[in-house]
Amino acid sequence: MEYKLAHKFLYDKAVDKGYIQLANHIKKVGPLKIKVSKMDFVSHLSKIIIGQQLSVQSAAAIWKRTDKILKENKYKKENIKLNQKFKDAGLSRQKIEYLNGIIFNKDLINISKKELKRMSAAEYFDFLIQIKGIG
């Protein structure tokens, strides 16, 4: 229900400030509900990194190939063979670096959704900002 309160707040604020066109648009669009990803946290962050600065179609194609590699991944640390698979999937050197920083990060691997939800906004920010490619 929080999304409905956010919608009402934005609508009321636009009216208060005299932004009638914006208020009408907010009213017309209605409340937006954000869906929570069902992916594990590491996969979710990996998909976000891959999708940065790409067209939707390119990101989807590269993610499909990368997701397959990740699901088959039995590696315990970064290595040349895995990096080559990522490169063949269409990832740049920099994105491979970022992806390795996520998939081999023990803190990310071990954290639960419950722990993430318990974090304050500042704690969550600090937790994510330390990760290369996000921070």
What are these regions (language model features)?
Residues 19, 54-55, 59-131:
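Alpha-helical ds-nucleic-acid-binding substructure associated with the helix-hairpin-helix region
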Residues 34-43, 90-93:
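Structural motif
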